[in-house]
Amino acid sequence: MENQIKANNKKEFDEWFKPFSEKLQLRSNLTNSASLCDRVPDLALAEMKMALATDDKEKDSVFSNALVEATRFCAPIYECAWTCSTGVVQKSLSWFDKNKDFIKLWDAKYMDLKKGIPEPEQLVSYQQAAQKWRKDVGYEINQFTRSLTHPVVAEYKVPGELLLMSRMLSDMIRRRNVLLNGDGENAGKKVLISREHVSWGRELAGGKFQVVFNPPWGDINKCGKSGIPLAATAMVKVAELDGSKKLEDIRQALLDLKKWVEDNKDALEDGKGNELVQTMTKHLAKHVELSKKSNALRAQGAQIDTPFSAYYWAWSAGVKPETFFTLSQFLFEMGQSARGGKKMIKALTSTPLRWGKGLINLFADDDFLGNRLYMHPAVLTPGRMSEMGACFGVIPVASPEDAILGSGHSKNILNFKIDTSVQNPCASTIVQLIQNPEIWL
């Protein structure tokens, strides 16, 4: 047995994929990239089972199985096959051997990352490594294999006949805020930045350095309740809303301010001009620090580069090109029915293949210190096994035709369209999964 998706480049892969796709009769009426999906999943049976469930354990089992069924046939087959092709497998596993120094900042500290929250530099290093891997391997062959370079702006619409959705979504937002901000009387309260302060930051970025002489909050050194200068938070918000290029615009405005101060010393009180320049330079440095932490410490699940992390885990666990097909088969079977963390560990322990215990050794500690929402994207958990499944387990590479049976992994759901002209299958499926109040109350 061996990997049957034999291709070293896109041309060879397309030649392999054409007869394969015709045999599977792929379609794209409900998904962005062609899939096996021919209808929006019907989860009525799961809803009935949920209503009859008597405890949380049973409810979790019902929901997990419903998630598998909801995502079983919607995976992007072309992209999954490319990710598992012999050329990508060989190049990716070799890439980590050759780039140990490039990933050292977080790879060498993996045992620490299993236990606690990463440093921002370790997150930035991960992102840089992921981009280098994509370029070196030649992974990006179409719009669905490219990494994002700009924010995704999308409006999700839920059919009005669905009851309790507003209440449910409000509760989900509240729970998210508790995760982000902690529990207590201030939990869920978002720190608001005045529109007036944002306008001030935009004017500064626009080259109007004179706004620093009279900021809307008064003293340029004034801090908010967090102890952070208001000038710094205003600049951070502008960069967040309008793009990181605004940082360079602000830096240029401060250089213009410095030159103006040097040329107009007589118009300023002794020493005040240089003091102002130093103050704004300090605030700019604070802005850079805050921006780095703000960008890096957003939910790490959202920042995970799924194929890159999947290959990192495979490499770290000792998977070789010759044994890759066994991992693919394991993940394919994992997508046939839901497995909790304990069953996952038991299955990995039972396999005679060395990568089984290798993956277990990568799992984050049960007593992880801090908010797991901020766990480094290179750290594996039983839940993140689904990320690997979405890459390597949709098509069992030793027998690709078996993909017709489907394999459910949560990230597959992102392939559903959000187009209302086809009844927004993405929103419809998600709503079916979470509309039952028993799941979220």
Curated annotation (Swiss-Prot):
On modification after translation, the UniProt record reads: Cleaved at the DEVD motif by host CASP3/caspase 3 in mammalian cells giving rise to cleavage products that remain associated. Only the monomeric form is cleaved. Little or no cleavage in tick cells. Caspase cleavage reduces the viral polymerase activity. Caspase cleavage is not required for productive infection in mammalian or tick host cells.
Which is a Gene Ontology cellular component entry for this protein?
Answer: helical viral capsid
Q: What is known of its domains?
A: The DEVD motif is a CASP3/caspase 3 cleavage site essential for viral replication in host cell. However, the importance for viral replication is apprently not linked to caspase cleavage. This motif is involved in homooligomerization.
Protein localization: Virion
Note how many cofactor molecules are bound and how: Stimulated by divalent cations such as Mn2+, Co2+, and Mg2+.
Please tell me which stretches of this chain the record labels as motif DEVD.
Answer: 266-269
Homology family:
Belongs to the nairovirus nucleocapsid protein family.
Role played: Binds dsRNA and ssRNA and probably participates in the packaging of viral genome. In the dsRNA binding mode, the nucleocapsid protein specifically binds to the vRNA panhandle secondary structure formed at the termini of viral genome. Does not discriminate between viral and nonviral RNAs through ssRNA binding mode. Displays dsDNA endonuclease activity that is sequence non-specific.
Q: Which gene encodes it?
A: N
The record ties this protein, via InterPro entries, to: Nairo_nucleocap
In chain numbering, the residues marked as site (Homooligomerization) are F213, V277, P352
User: Which protein is depicted?
Assistant: Nucleoprotein
Q: Where is this site: Cleavage by host CASP3/caspase 3?
A: E269, D270
Q: Can you name one GO molecular function term for this protein?
A: RNA binding
